[in-house]
Amino acid sequence: RERLKEYYDLGARFTKWRAVYKIGNKFPSSQSIKSNAHALARYAALVQEAKMVPIVEPEVLMDGSHDIDKCYQVTTDVLNECYNELLIHKVDLKGTVLKPNMIIPGSECTKKSNADEIAQKTLDCLKKNVPSEVTGIAFLSGGQTEIEASKNLNQINKINDTNFLITFSYGRGLQASALKEFGKNQNNSGGIQKAFNHRAKMNGLSSKGAWSENLEKEATA
């Protein structure tokens, strides 16, 4: 509570807590899912008590050879438990932002999925497991390439028939190109800024379902 008050006094209005779930033969276990959900809910309740907005981030990692259906199943279990705990802790869901993973196959899975399948399964998972009171959903990129992250977000928004406002909260999906330019020449501030601005623009369009591969090509031509 003391730290939250300090952050508020410094001007913070949003906070984030991340719980990580790795898919394997015996994990995540039901106990780890429950323990992480409890921690996320306790955090969210304390943050709202401190008059800030909690960003709740339960991330099912891409690491592994699992297929898209396994990701769907684990994400379903994770989201269900998270919202059970959030309700137990009397968190006002309207005052939260969910930062989830998309439903995608593991990075080592031999069976790849296209953007249509990813979007359909992701939106279906959200509809079935996220209460309608949650209006803000900001996806993490989770190891996807920049183009994949933009393309999949765009497709999700194109078929979004819910009240969810779906946007992005990317790390690598927003910064990778800029960091690459920085690695080439740290003094090239213009090139670094241009790379960052481009990805911000592309992801902004994806948040409206207005991104296209042609826009990517035009911008880099």
Language-model segments: which ranges?
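Active-site capping/gating regions of soluble enzymes
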Residues: 66-221
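Helix-rich catalytic cores of soluble enzyme domains
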Residues: 1-86
